[in-house]
From Swiss-Prot:
Residues 120-151 are annotated as: Required for FBXL14-triggered degradation. Changing residue 228 to A: Very minor effect on binding to KPNB1 and nuclear import. Strongly reduces binding to KPNB1 and nuclear import. Its main location: nucleus. Expressed in a variety of tissues with the highest expression in kidney. Expressed in mesenchymal and epithelial cell lines. Changing residue 215 to E: Impairs binding to KPNB1, KPNA2, IPO7 and TNPO1. No change in subcellular localization. This is Zinc finger protein SNAI1. It comes from Homo sapiens (Human). Gene3D superfamilies: Classic Zinc Finger. The lineage of its organism: Eukaryota, Metazoa, Chordata, Craniata, Vertebrata. The modification Phosphoserine is found at residues 11, 82, 92, 96, 100, 104, 107, 111, 115, 119, 246.
Length: 264
């Protein structure tokens, strides 16, 4: 340890310490070289300090508990283990490798969490939290309600049709009630766009015209059907005369006209 740590700091901050005086005033920190045997013997502490139990009186623990604490009888443990060792070593060389069955696997240790302990823990949890038992019941009721709603069918009161959604049933009921009525002729329709196409037949408006010819139509669906007549692909064929048509309606009209098997 440096000697600067052993110096006492002066009280006056302006005063500078004199280290030479401090060395003369503390002669016990100076040792003579080389050390002789007398100095070494004086530095060794007495036996009372090295072994305090020899000089201190017996404590309460030593007088009361120490006689009860006896060393472990290792010999008795060895004697208890010796029959097992003798039993294992008593097998002869013939039995050790011929006709001996393999040792059975060790039985599993009994689980500390048995069914009774689990049930008791659940009972304690339900007793501590009364609302805990209602949560599974509420979930079960919600699942049952969803299943009933999924299985529930909406029946039409005008016919025997059934629908899984209420919106689909309402759209179907419009086909019975026909709420869209024409103001000119009184004809009713289930959809407003159907009524709009019908009104054009009274006004003569035909906003949908064919780009290939001069024909025009009041409804877009009629224009779409007319465009198939301009197509090169005619997939509807008459089996009697092998004529092809672009629309199924034209094929039916051809068959109703009395096809004799030859083109006219």
């Amino acid at each position: 340890m440096p000697r600067s740590f052993l110096v006492r700091k002066p009280s006056d901050p302006n005063r500078k310490p004199n280290y030479s005086e401090l060395q003369d005033s503390n002669p016990e920190f100076t040792f003579q070289q080389p050390y002789d045997q007398a100095h070494l013997l004086a530095a060794i502490p007495p036996p009372e300090i090295l072994n305090p139990t020899a000089s201190l009186p017996m404590l309460i623990w030593d007088s009361v508990l120490a006689p009860q604490a006896q060393p472990i009888a290792w010999a008795s443990l060895r004697l208890q283990e010796s029959p097992r060792v003798a039993e294992l070593t008593s097998l002869s060389d013939e039995d050790s490798g011929k006709g001996s069955q393999p040792p059975s696997p060790p039985s599993p240790a009994p689980s500390s969490f048995s069914s009774t302990s689990v049930s008791s823990l659940e009972a304690e949890a339900y007793a501590a939290f009364p609302g805990l038992g209602q949560v599974p019941k509420q979930l079960a009721q919600l699942s049952e309600a969803k299943d009933l709603q999924a299985r529930k069918a909406f029946n039409c009161k005008y016919c025997n049709k059934e629908y899984l959604s209420l919106g689909a049933l309402k759209m179907h009921i419009r086909s019975h009630t026909l709420p869209c009525v024409c103001g000119t002729c009184g004809k009713a329709f289930s959809r407003p766009w159907l009524l709009q196409g019908h009104v054009r037949t009274h006004t003569g408006e035909k906003p949908f015209s064919c780009p290939h010819c001069s024909r025009a139509f009041a409804d877009r669906s009629n224009l779409r059907a007319h465009l198939q007549t301009h197509s090169d692909v005619k997939k509807y064929q008459c089996q009697a005369c092998a004529r092809t048509f672009s629309r199924m309606s034209l094929l039916h009209k051809h068959q109703e006209s009395g096809c004799s098997g030859c083109p006219r």
